[in-house]
């Protein structure tokens, strides 16, 4: 059970980044990308703790079988659970489902950061603008969207907004350390 786990030991299909890259390769060959998922997270516990994704309050996955402190620490692949974040215009069923169809979603586990990600042809001063989100939508695509190649084949600019989880009085949140962007592409080598 040695920790940390070597990521290279996982099958390549265990990483969504590889599935996304395979979709790009299929699109290059056939014009169709069957792998354009939106991402959400959720818990799969059997303890009636939906939304209970804080590590400090983790009560286990199966209740009586892993209820001891030792058993809670025994499985490196377990965590308190995931959460789905959906960027809908309003908190109504139809607006939420429309945002899910747009794939304007993300998954998180444990903490509850507020993240926005856009790509497009942006001015380099976008971050200083008071209407940055409006400009981001107007000149690009949000997370989950399909980014078309620009006429001049220029690389897109990213606009990212991330706010840390506010935490609670009992469990204050830590500052964000970094944002990691994993880039995938297809070239002549595949």
Regions found by a protein language model. Give the residues of each.
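C-terminal functional module detector
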Residues: 1-190
């Amino acid at each position: 059970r040695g920790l940390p786990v070597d990521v290279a030991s996982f099958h390549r299909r265990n990483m969504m980044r590889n599935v996304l890259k395979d979709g790009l390769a299929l699109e290059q060959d056939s014009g169709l990308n069957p792998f354009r998922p939106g991402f959400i997270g959720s818990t799969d516990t059997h303890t009636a703790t939906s939304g209970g994704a804080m590590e400090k309050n983790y009560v286990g996955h199966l209740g009586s079988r892993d209820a001891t402190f030792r058993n809670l620490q025994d499985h490196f692949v377990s965590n308190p659970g995931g959460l789905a974040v959906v960027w809908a215009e309003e908190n109504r069923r139809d607006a939420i489902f429309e945002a899910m169809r747009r794939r304007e979603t993300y998954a998180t586990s444990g903490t509850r950061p507020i993240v926005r990600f856009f790509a497009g042809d942006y001015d380099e001063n976008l971050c200083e603008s008071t209407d940055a989100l409006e400009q981001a939508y107007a000149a690009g695509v949000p997370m989950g969207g399909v980014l078309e190649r620009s006429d001049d084949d220029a690389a897109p600019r990213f606009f990212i907004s991330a706010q840390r989880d506010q935490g609670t009085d009992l469990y204050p949140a830590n500052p964000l350390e970094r944002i990691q962007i994993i880039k995938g592409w297809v070239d002549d080598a595949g």
